[in-house]
UniProtKB/Swiss-Prot annotation:
Subcellular location: Cytoplasm
Native organism: Vitis vinifera
Superkingdom to which the source organism belongs: Eukaryota
Annotated ranges, domain GS catalytic: 106-356
Name listed for the protein in its UniProt record: Glutamine synthetase cytosolic isozyme 1
Gene: GS1-1
Cellular component GO terms, alphabetical: cytoplasm
Amino acid sequence: MALLSDLINLNLSETTEKVIVEYIWVGGSGMDLRSKARTLSGPVSDPAKLPKWNYDGSSTGQAPGEDSEVILYPQAIFKDPFRRGNNILVMCDTYTPAGEPIPTNKRCNAAKIFSHPDVAAEVPWYGIEQEYTLLQKEVKWPIGWPVGGFPGPQGPYYCGIGADKAWGRDIVDAHYKACLYAGINISGINGEVMPGQWEYQVGPSVGISAGDELWVSRYILERITEIAGVVLSFDPKPIQGDWNGAGAHTNYSTKSMRNDGGFEVIKKAIEKLGLRHKEHIAAYGEGNERRLTGRHETADINTFLWGVANRGASIRVGRDTEKAGKGYFEDRRPASNMDPYVVTSMIAETTILWKP
């Protein structure tokens, strides 16, 4: 008698050329991901060869009921770690039937910024540190925490090991390998300062691909937590009090910064970011004011500070970069629930295109 798992793991390529394509898009909140699948006649490796598709935007908060169709434009293909074989995941962005990007489509504007010749010439690299919290499904309280109570104070949990310090490692490792399988440039994982909280890093990725890879890595993570019966939270401050929040520190460099004399270019870029601090904060995630308090390795939301090796700064420059006189910097302001299309393109726009 076949088990459910046997059928889920059926190898389609033994009997058919057909493939399953999972179309993924950002939903109406600008933070939720949605997806649905369709069958195609054979393997596809170029997003331009995938058909556009549509969905009911009135059910995702993205269109009115009387004109509910939203069109999906396939943009980036990844291998599907759940169905495996020649089956794929595809990150899409969203348009009206007339071809206008809908308000939650932040990819379209980001792609325009990244295709600007001045930006493209600088080959912007991004490394994004995505923090997240795993919650118990019934009570929405972090895993490993006593229900309605608290664990011991922070200290033992960051990069910690052991049944009394690390909870959810099976999810973390499953996600790590699934992202590598999918073709996402995931570069590492670690346990975070607050118990039940973890981080993974995506990058270095160039331009628009940083946003595509981060969104699909989030999709894969939420699918894995669904299987595990755990709730995934990107809330920037899931637990009030003396507990670290969750961010999405964004590491950034341009060709000029990576070349000799790059430290001077970095300092000019940071100066420009300081002049547009308010605009960046407004675009860096919902609820970030609960996280950026000046405590727990953050700078106060209303203050712009930068420093070498300073984790209480808005922008941190690494000692290696200072020593080499070239390299990258880290924008520590983005919240864990930020839209990577918005954050990556805005950093490029401010540091390369914007003239104060």
